Amino acid sequence: MEGIFAAYVLPALIIALKSVVLLVVLLIVVAYLLYADRKIWAAVQLRRGPNVVGPWGLFQRFADLLKFVFKEPIIPSGANKGVFLLAPFIFAVLAMATWAVIPVNEGWAVANINVGILYIFAISSLEVYGVIMGGWASNSKYPFLGALRSAAQMVSYEVSIGFVIVTVLLTVGSLNLTDIVLSQNTGLGTMLGLPASFLDWNWLCLFPMFVVFFISALAETNRPPFDLVEAESELVAGHMIEYSSTPFLLFFLGEYVAITLMCALMTVLFLGGWLPPVDVWFLSWVPGIIWFMLKLCFCFFLFAMVKAFVPRYRYDQLMRLGWKVFLPISLFMVVATATFLKVFGLA
């Protein structure tokens, strides 16, 4: 009996505890990143932003949570009730499930699997089903159009993200996210005789793919200027028009969890994860999770600034950018990276 407990029950309890801690921390981080997003947008527009609930409006997100929870969920009379309520739950759960393999520090992951990046790519690809189900089950024109746009948009830009992953795989030789971070201890900077620093991270040697991944992440998460799924001037709120109360909150939460995931992936794949910007003694003393969060916040700041400054693309421009610009660039970079590694004997 003790052997069964040690072999099966205890590991399961540890994983469950890790998952609960991750979920709580993730929701708090997402709440304050959303607060930061609103503050940045307000600053650009010369407004104050959230400033009523708590000091400097710091508790605004918690007030919004209470507001959503205590509102009555309204289901349209012609909607498919079961699918209508299931869609936001699927979307939010899949968005949060992808975080299970993200290492915020060395050894700090719920599941450190060897195909971590492939797992994220597979699970995040399923999120589109939540949007499609919500748009179809609403039995309304605007949500259905938003769902169709979402399907086309996500499929189009997942191709480019897939080629970015292939390029990183060729460079590192592993799909394990921890291995990808540790491989960035050496790179272009150390080849030039410099100490380990940000010059060794993948953003420099794979800069075109860094740009492709960043812009594709904007499209994949329906962020401006690619928010065609819920374009206010055309579709009001897209697939979320008929949603209110907790179901709407789940869609909204899932969207920002997905945005935070893309920022974390940029940090892991291109910005050295938890590694300090320069490997010197006083920076190495700073816990790795602090560096990881600073880099994640920097990526989120870029997302927020794009939202504030770049006008929305037309739908045909969005598709053209994905298929006629990013796809050829991604293919070329995969071939160029493989050729370079083979010619110089680094493969």
Swiss-Prot record:
Gene Ontology biological process terms in this record: aerobic respiration
E.C. designation(s): 7.1.1.-
Protein's name in the database: NADH-quinone oxidoreductase subunit H
Record-linked InterPro entries: NADH_UbQ_OxRdtase_su1/FPO (IPR001694), NADH_UbQ_OxRdtase_su1_CS (IPR018086)
Keyword Transmembrane helix carried by entry: yes
Functional note: NDH-1 shuttles electrons from NADH, via FMN and iron-sulfur (Fe-S) centers, to quinones in the respiratory chain. The immediate electron acceptor for the enzyme in this species is believed to be ubiquinone. Couples the redox reaction to proton translocation (for every two electrons transferred, four hydrogen ions are translocated across the cytoplasmic membrane), and thus conserves the redox energy in a proton gradient. This subunit may bind ubiquinone.
Presence of the UniProt keyword Membrane in the record: yes
Catalytic activity: a quinone + NADH + 5 H(+)(in) = a quinol + NAD(+) + 4 H(+)(out)
The gene coding this protein: nuoH
GO molecular function: NADH dehydrogenase activity; oxidoreductase activity, acting on NAD(P)H, quinone or similar compound as acceptor; quinone binding
Organism of this sequence: Brucella melitensis biotype 1 (strain ATCC 23456 / CCUG 17765 / NCTC 10094 / 16M)
Pfam families xref list: NADHdh (PF00146)
PANTHER family named in the record: NADH DEHYDROGENASE SUBUNIT 1 (PTHR11432), NADH-UBIQUINONE OXIDOREDUCTASE CHAIN 1 (PTHR11432:SF3)
Record keywords: Cell inner membrane, Cell membrane, Membrane, NAD, Quinone, Translocase, Transmembrane, Transmembrane helix, Ubiquinone
Transmembrane segments: 13-33, 82-102, 115-135, 161-181, 198-218, 248-268, 286-306, 325-345
Subunit structure of this chain's protein: NDH-1 is composed of 14 different subunits. Subunits NuoA, H, J, K, L, M, N constitute the membrane sector of the complex.
NCBIfam families for this protein: PRK06076.1-2, PRK06076.1-6
